[in-house]
Swiss-Prot record:
Cofactor: binding comment: Binds 1 nickel ion per subunit.
SUPFAM superfamilies: ACT-like, Ribbon-helix-helix
Alphabetical list of Pfam families matching this protein: NikR_C, RHH_1
Binding-site residues for Ni(2+), renumbered to this chain: H79, H90, H92, C98
Sample GO molecular function, one term: nickel cation binding
Gene3D superfamilies recorded: ACT-like. Chain A, domain 2 (3.30.70.1150), Met repressor-like (1.10.1220.10)
Species this protein is from: Anaeromyxobacter dehalogenans (strain 2CP-C)
Keywords associated with the record: DNA-binding, Metal-binding, Nickel, Transcription, Transcription regulation
Family per similarity comment: Belongs to the transcriptional regulatory CopG/NikR family.
Matches recorded under HAMAP family: NikR
Function summary: Transcriptional regulator.
Protein's recorded name: Putative nickel-responsive regulator
Any one GO biological process: response to nickel cation
Length: 139
């Protein structure tokens, strides 16, 4: 069941929003607003959980594989937390740089700790932990 709501926006904000949703390919404002709300709910659930609930996240890493034992350190962290690693994708971007994308799933505090550990590993050029969802609580 859908409920209709109304919102008020400052001058120019609606114009910017319409441009954004057109660029992203949304067919209407409603679907774009629903996606914004879903994203906010996922973020809140991830950050406000007790840490015991199951959570899903994606970690993106870019690093120089020639960097002194960095690849081994990253692999070690993954092996220490192997139950949380659902999937790992490793891409050779060029002769030196690697892109690694990991899907993590487990207790929230464990997922966050592992993701932050990977991102903070010395030598990682870019790292990001992005909360995701298994979709159970979303409509």
């Amino acid at each position: 069941m859908l409920e209709r709501i109304g919102i008020s926006l400052e001058d120019g904000l609606l114009e910017q929003f319409d441009k954004l949703i057109a660029e992203k390919g949304y067919v209407n404002r409603s679907e774009a607003v629903r996606d914004l709300i879903r994203d906010a709910l996922v973020q809140r659930a991830f950050t406000e959980s007790s840490g015991r609930e199951e959570r899903v996240a994606v970690v993106t890493l870019v690093y120089d594989h020639d960097s002194s034992s960095l690849a081994q350190k990253l692999a070690h962290i993954q092996h220490e937390n192997h139950r949380a690693v659902v999937s790992a994708l490793h891409v050779h971007m060029d002769a030196h740089n690697c892109l690694e994308v990991l899907v993590l799933r487990g207790r929230g505090k464990d997922v966050v700790a592992m993701g932050e550990s990977l991102v903070a590993t010395k030598g990682v050029k870019y790292g990001k932990l992005v909360p995701a969802t298994a979709g159970h609580d979303l409509r």
